[in-house]
Amino acid sequence: MTGKGCIIELKNVSKIFEDTCALDNINLQIANGEFLTLLGPSGCGKTTILRIISGFETPDVGEILIAGVNVSGFPPERRQVNTVFQHYALFPHMTVRDNVAFGLRMQKCPREKVNELVFEALRMVHLENFADRRPSQLSGGQQQRVAIARAVVNKPLLLLLDEPFSALDHKLRQIMQLEIKHLQRKLGITFVFVTHDQEEAFAMSDRVVVMNQGRIEQIGTPQCIYEEPVNLFVARFVGEINNLAGTILSCNDEGIYEAAIANEVFPLRTPHRFSPGEAVNVLLRPEDIRIYLLDEEVLKVPHLRGRIEETVYKGATVDIIIALDVGGTLRVAEFFNEDDAEISYNEGERVAVTWVDGWEVVLPHEMA
């Protein structure tokens, strides 16, 4: 957690629905002013955490603390927490202004104060000129902004966002990601965001919580999660990964291991401790692998051999699929430069592959 002080804490929280364990002993601290994302596949428990924080669900075991107060038995209206849902839940018969003002009026806020706060909220989301329109007269992105304005107008301690971009197209999602991140920084409110989209999580978050089957697999910065995954599930969920099976042979005085991978011996750098003979997974991101022709200097260093099976042009990058002589394939990503002839590979061409020294992730063996 960052050094800003804890605003939300979940202590030993568990929740069971019928025969399904939705949350299994969750412990999580969220810093004041932090943008934290719960990332994981459908059914992993991330939305259940949101509902428990907001008060729409009650944990079977554990406590929820907001600003140091145990709110486990508090109803939603006493928690100073607002939620933006997937489908916005705007009132179709009300104007934008009235939608944003609804909560303030329910709280008996004075009319002048309501008008002031509503205008401020709409201005922050660039909709001050749309106050008299109805939701049906707005685009999907504009409806999204109205929902966010309504959620922040009363300045809650915490804003929860449950996959709010799911109904938007890819380009609009990217625009909204930047707008939400900027708005959160401006407001200083703690945001807890739920998504199954790794790129979305990485683009917006101070920290990411990767979840699977009701458990937290890893918590860290986007860079830490991507570059230092703690297990195969995390490595695969947050991007493309190549998995090579290896066996530890030895370790020198500098802590560099030697491992047998296929028919070669490779040096491996890792903070983990292994014993000779131990099986490991050597994980490589596609962008960390290098391709060479067989007559190049790479033949003097450890490498694997194979042939080009397929190339996939993606605009900024080209994906190259290599069928290894020892079996299996590697996916390699190279940045595309139309002036660079070296990125042109022919199907069936023989190549050697190695990787950037020290960029491998070495983990205890798990079944693939």
From Swiss-Prot:
Which keywords annotate this record?
A: ATP-binding, Cell membrane, Membrane, Nucleotide-binding, Translocase, Transport
Pfam families xrefs: ABC_tran (PF00005), TOBE_2 (PF08402)
Name the InterPro entries on file.
AAA+_ATPase (IPR003593), ABC_SmlMolc_Importer (IPR050093), ABC_transporter-like_ATP-bd (IPR003439), ABC_transporter-like_CS (IPR017871), Mo/tungstate-bd_C_term_dom (IPR008995), P-loop_NTPase (IPR027417), PotA-like (IPR005893), PotA_ATP-bd (IPR017879)
Domain spans labelled ABC transporter = 8-238
What is the protein's membrane topology class?
Peripheral membrane protein
The record's EC number reads 7.6.2.11
Compartment(s) where it occurs, according to its Swiss-Prot or TrEMBL record = Cell membrane
Primary location group: membrane
Name the domain of life this protein comes from.
Answer: Bacteria
- Supply the enzyme class, top level: translocase
Disulfides per UniProt: none
The UniProt GO MF terms for this protein read: ABC-type putrescine transporter activity; ATP binding; ATP hydrolysis activity
> Reaction catalysed?
ATP + H2O + polyamine-[polyamine-binding protein]Side 1 = ADP + phosphate + polyamineSide 2 + [polyamine-binding protein]Side 1
Which residues are listed for ATP binding in this entry?
40-47
Record's GO cellular component terms: ATP-binding cassette (ABC) transporter complex
Q: What's the stated role of this polypeptide?
A: Part of the ABC transporter complex PotABCD involved in spermidine/putrescine import. Responsible for energy coupling to the transport system.
Q: Which family does it belong to?
A: Belongs to the ABC transporter superfamily. Spermidine/putrescine importer (TC 3.A.1.11.1) family.
Q: How does it assemble?
A: The complex is composed of two ATP-binding proteins (PotA), two transmembrane proteins (PotB and PotC) and a solute-binding protein (PotD).
Name the UniProt record assigns to this protein: Spermidine/putrescine import ATP-binding protein PotA
Gene name in the database record: potA
